[in-house]
């Protein structure tokens, strides 16, 4: 998806520094925002060459746009209507983990109600590293172009760039154009499949709960800039049928132009951060994370309980000053397999129910948290402390 304004400022400033010291940089991307292109040109001057290869790609997508929220029943009915297809591997991409989990449960219920035996799978970022590794291995196998299947996979933005997969059909919420086109790249990836019928179904309206809505007043919980989301709706609302790579580029250049974004909060935040970097203000803020996303690593108590003997052995190795460095690193990596990275606002030290902390190294503690976790759904709920008869 589109980089946060802070991260974009770091990247462009970093590229500028690399070239200043004689380095060469190649940026390969399927979606280059005009604003980012302009900022690169300003940072690098004449020492830049830009080429667009979108016209070389075959048409891969046929689009059907829905001006409503992404609903499980619509996905299910469409999937059933494709029963005569040799393969109908279906990828559902949601904007939040909560939405993905809901749609997964709903699709499982619909399949059971209709008595249809189909593999329905869930993948998002709130699994332990060990569980996620297994799921990613499975989706990579299913996602091979030559693999024929009727499976349904529900996921989030983690499939946009990190996984090389090729599905037959896509159902997705709109986030913004850049993210959307990355998601579409997971369908008919090599352009070898027919596009006589729609293979990408896009819901323009967000399904997420109010606190995750794009206009939320809490910027830490928002997942898209207001202006960029509104412009993306405007760009996609009249799209229908075969959707060429050139058309995608035209929409980005038209609706995400420098002029349209100039007054947006996104650009204002970018410019402020870039100015801070130019003035080396970063030295005074070296304790702040690069991205405006604060994550905390945790271990679910149920996972800890199942693997307590091995984890305690690893803790002993880590604490023992006589242990070899290689053994300590191996022990840390073993424990990392049971960790989940979650947003900071989900774990509050004075409220969250924790069992203990595991110290991996100085100033790096991993809390063991009481929560609802299993390898099917991933992390669902983090439990709060009980005090007397009250739940805080």
What is the predicted function of each stretch?
Residues 2-5, 63-70, 148:
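Short, flexible loop segments at the rims of nucleotide/cofactor-binding pockets, characterized by
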Residues 21-26, 89, 149-152:
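Loop/turn-to-beta-strand initiation segments
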Residues 33-85:
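Interdomain hinge/linker at the junction between the two RecA-like core domains of SF2 helicases
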Residues 28-32, 96, 154-158, 172:
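Ser/Thr-glycine-rich phosphate-binding loops at phosphate-binding pockets of nucleotides
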Residues 37, 74-93, 100-144, 167, ...:
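C-terminal helicase lobe and adjacent C-terminal extensions/tails of nucleic-acid helicase motors
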Residues 1-54:
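Post-DEXD/H (motif II) to motif III coupling segment of the RecA-like Helicase ATP-binding lobe
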Residues 145-160:
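Conserved two-lobed SF2 helicase motor
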Residues 1-2, 33, 99, 161, ...:
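Residues immediately C-terminal
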